């Protein structure tokens, strides 16, 4: 079957691309760039997926600018690829059919904060760190924390989550409404600011996770949370990865409202010690954080400690000072870069899956054995409170046999998760890298429904083609 996206002109009709570039240059002047170095920066560079740069990059400053870009591209059937900060991991920002990358660097304003309603309105180029800095004196924060300082538009587009998801949910739980430019240049508002609605189809949830394939997000209304009265963090060693996972499972099943519970295997601890200047014992660890009142945090910590001791874990090492907590969680967020330091010159390829919490230990243990049997270097980390974990494969890209073994390992991991009634991607998204698993995970009826939605909203296939469905 020829992908629907192939109907888009892109590289298939250079004359149309030239016409689009001329029209955009007339409209945007030096905010349109065609230099090869800039175009290559706007394509995938962090996995083994081929770098596929766009034909041009444009830097809009308003929703009206985005509408003009889309209308010009639509008139010539040239693809449009949204770009936030480029931290996605499955080829989302690649341009397999050429086209125009829309970089939201200059749409980075916090438009409104409604502290009394616990929400805010932002442009898509605002990063999570920038938003929380803006909110610093309000007593509020935005809790979704994927590690990378990603743009909020990109976080919504991939339906990402992060270390706080076990307590605060994922992006789908924290986006109240969106403004979206559709493939014909029209502006759609998906909802109002009310915390709940029964008014028609849930268009917000449809767009969140659509990876730019249905429209271009130009503003987001986000749910905010109050900064907890008390925050307590710490690390707890365990004799095995299985014991770590079982502790996480029992913590969740016991109803302890942990804010973060993160797994790092012994290899990842070794890497983090070296990279982040920590001195942790090189054994499997859980990094934890508890939020609430002083009394509730103390109670949560006590209950977790009892679970840990039953499984041979401990002692629990508290990070009581704010600077120690920051250092600890920065080390967790730097795990990708720390992992890369284990094997200099290698390419780090990250992949993730998510399984029902009751199958977590089984899936992680089987994956750890698979890594060893594959003769690969691949630390395991994970947001294990909701059954989500990651592999960071360190691959010699000049070794074809090693590349083949790594790809086979990733395929087995996705298949293993799906067989356990899980998903091939908990938070990285589908992009180009995981399209092939959707049939096994969702079935042909679901894929046909997705294609019908895509056809209805993007009949010419110009919106980030070659991603999610073909």
Residue ranges and their predicted role:
Residues 30, 418-430, 459-463:
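Alpha-helix capping/hinge segments and adjacent helical runs
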Residues 109-262:
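FAD-binding subdomain of flavoenzyme oxidoreductases
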Residues 34-42, 225-226, 232-412, 416, ...:
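C-terminal substrate-recognition/cap domain of FAD-linked oxidoreductases
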Residues 186, 435-470:
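Activity-critical C-terminal alpha-helical subdomain
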Residues 1-71, 87-118, 268-276, 322-350, ...:
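N-terminal flexible segment immediately upstream of the FAD-binding catalytic core
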